[in-house]
A protein has these predicted regions:
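Structural motif
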Residues: 60-65, 113-120, 157-163, 220-226, ...
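Serine-hydrolase catalytic core recognition
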Residues: 294, 426-631
Length: 631
């Protein structure tokens, strides 16, 4: 990526006169190398006691427990140097059993796609201190404990396996038809993983007597050949002189997808059944999840056009399924609907934009709407959970502004309380039991600040990371930046962000670089430290130091402004998005300090696609453009 950024900068430098580097300027190698990266608290796992969280130590040798109230280290959950049996030098991650008496220790991790990976797992018994292999059959994927912690299911080679920890880690194979590029059990194929943001498609029921999973038959999906080079895969010495090829099933838009079905396995009787899910042959199953009732399996289906989502409640033994909720949309149903789905007792809740904005709805398992939890002309972005004792719901929303996000709770009577106190962008990780939360706050002017707070009233308990030193270091180096809005010739108001040189002179005319992503539901213009390509306005300030004005505008199709604004691009991607970027360039060209003859546009992925669409829109608004990794 560094080489690409240097090439991009070189291409765009033709638009502006050279500017001399100074001792107090940003260096591109420092930006791309992470020298200005803010500090975070990574890998937080809330613990069962509701009072603490665990995380992997920086040296990757321990699992450390911290207090949710003080943030202080209060114990060690696992230490490679003290474990009996297998000896490890370190590890990559871990999974706690629900009762926290056992831990899966993740080692030798190898990435597959964006979210999928294989790893060699070891099982650690907290009570005995013994560490031993989970399986001797090879690396595993997405291992999952049963609710009682006595079993582990995982995927290997497209098949599901089960390990019974009370029987000497006895391993059995649940499925046998898994085959690369043909049949996959329990984990999604590439397109389902990528588009539905998941890497696991199986679950245990509440009493650990049943397994359910999605089976993907991709035998009829077209094959795509992707070249592999030694430069990106140094271990592949055979590609030193000539590239190799990775062949996998990749359905382009409109092509045949994998055919999906939902199966169950009776662990005691070893009987496999196929659920009778009423769905079309080209439908998706983005989620399955057992409820708190061991005999009730929730199956979420989505039609090919993604404008109808059905939630079925099925019996894993009789295989009969009953429709609980049918969600329909004029355009499409976003990932937040099935991605936010949570079950608790005899109820479930999820996010829907059926009234024009994304809000939280509560149902019972029979499919009856209990109530609409939130309402208003704003989007709820995250659903954190419901307190079983008080009935309070915890969530984040853009109630204050499409550019900002805050954390809230609503009690059982509908009274809302704001828990985050800072204006900007807030994200939370709640303790089990929802007594505390870790809040990460940032703004366009402030690097992330991580704090611990009370979930009752948002009271600050302690600050874990404030990035004050980083702020002090880079504040003198950042260029002027400001938010703005303008209205297009079609009457659409768009939000934007502009970075000007530190020595900006309104009497001069400056060349402009426009960056955009523009993908459905995305947001680049937010009051957060994530602003810009590398965050913190760093790259944009660097380019401003070279004599450019840098502009980012979120056009139609982006998120945070309700369903109509976000979904108006349905089935016509690249049309309205490109028009809005051209409108941005035309608007900028009318500003007295902009040289309208020197406006460039660029973007990455969907942003690369929209760069090409914008430059070929018909109105000659751009002098240059760079499309990186355009689909």
């Amino acid at each position: 990526m560094k080489k690409i950024m240097i090439l991009l900068s070189a291409v765009l430098f033709c638009l502006a006169p050279a500017a001399a580097a100074t001792a107090d300027s940003l260096a591109l190698k420092d930006i791309t190398g992470g020298s200005y990266s803010p500090g975070y608290v990574y890998g937080v796992t809330p613990m069962a006691d509701g009072e603490s969280y665990s995380r992997l130590s920086d040296d990757r040798k321990r699992i450390v427990r911290h207090s949710f109230k003080t943030g202080k280290e209060i114990g060690t959950v696992f230490d490679v140097e003290k474990a009996k049996g297998v000896k490890l030098k370190g590890f990559d991650g871990y999974v706690l059993s629900p009762d926290e008496n056992r831990i899966l220790i993740q080692t030798q991790t190898k990435a597959i796609y964006r979210r999928s990976f294989t790893a060699v797992y070891y099982i650690y018994d907290v009570r005995t201190g013994k560490l031993e292999p989970l399986s001797d059959g090879g690396p595993q994927q997405v291992p999952l404990f049963s609710p009682d912690g006595n079993q582990v299911a995982f995927v290997r080679g497209g098949n599901l396996f089960l390990v019974k920890l009370l029987y000497g880690n006895a391993e059995s194979q649940v499925t046998k038809d898994g085959k690369f590029n043909e049949i996959i059990n329990g984990i999604p194929d590439w397109v389902n993983e990528e588009e539905f943001s998941t890497n696991r498609s199986f679950d245990f029921n509440a009493d650990g007597t049943m397994l359910a999973w999605v089976r993907y038959d991709e035998s009829q999906v077209p094959i795509y050949d992707m070249q592999e080079f030694k430069g990106l895969s140094p271990e592949r010495m055979e590609y030193d002189e000539y590239p190799g090829s990775y062949r996998y099933k990749y359905p382009v838009a409109g092509a045949r997808n994998a055919t999906v079905s939902v199966l169950t396995f009776d662990i005691k009787n070893r009987v496999t059944r196929t659920m009778k899910v009423p769905m079309d042959s080209d439908s998706y199953v983005p989620r399955i999840k057992f409820t708190d009732n061991a005999d009730k399996l929730a199956i979420v289906t989505l039609n090919r056009l993604q404008n109808q989502m059905d939630i079925y409640i099925g019996n894993p033994r009789s295989t009969e399924c009953t429709l609980a909720v049918r969600e329909t949309a004029k355009k499409y149903i976003g990932e937040s609907a099935y991605g936010s789905l949570k079950f608790f007792g005899n109820n479930f809740a999820y996010l829907s934009d059926r009234d024009g904005f994304r809000h939280l709805y509560l149902y019972n398992l029979s499919g009856q709407l209990v109530k609409q939890v939130t309402r208003g002309s704003y989007d709820v972005t995250d659903f954190y959970g419901r307190d079983p004792k008080t009935g309070a719901f915890y969530y984040a929303s853009r109630q204050e502004s499409p550019l900002r996000k805050a954390v809230y709770c609503t009690d059982k009577n509908g009274r809302e309380k704001k828990l985050s106190t800072e204006t900007g962008t807030n994200s939370a990780i709640f303790s089990q039991g929802l007594r505390y939360f870790m809040n990460v706050y940032s703004s366009a002017a402030l690097p992330p600040v991580t704090t611990l707070r009370s979930a009752a009233d948002g009271k600050l308990l302690t600050t874990l990371v404030d990035n004050a030193a980083l702020k002090q270091r880079i504040e003198p180096l950042l260029a002027q930046h400001e938010f703005f809005t303008f209205t297009t010739s079609e009457g659409v108001q768009l939000n934007g962000w502009m970075v000007k040189p530190r020595d900006f002179d309104p009497a001069k005319r400056y060349p402009v670089i426009m960056y955009q992503y523009s993908g459905p539901g995305s947001q680049e213009v937010t009051d957060s430290w994530n602003l810009g390509f590398f965050g913190g306005a760093l790259y944009e300030s660097y380019m401003a130091g070279k004599g450019y004005i840098y502009v980012i505008v979120d056009g139609r199709g982006t998120g945070g402004r309700g369903a109509e604004f976000e979904q108006c691009t349905y089935l016509q991607l690249g049309d309205k998005e490109s028009k809005d970027q051209v409108e941005t360039a035309l608007y900028l060209g009318k500003l007295p300090y902009v040289d309208k003859e020197r406006i460039a546009i660029w973007g990455w992925s969907f942003g690369g696609f929209n760069t090409l669409m914008s430059m070929s829109e018909g109105r000659p608004a751009f002098r240059a453009g760079v499309a990186v990794a355009a689909p």
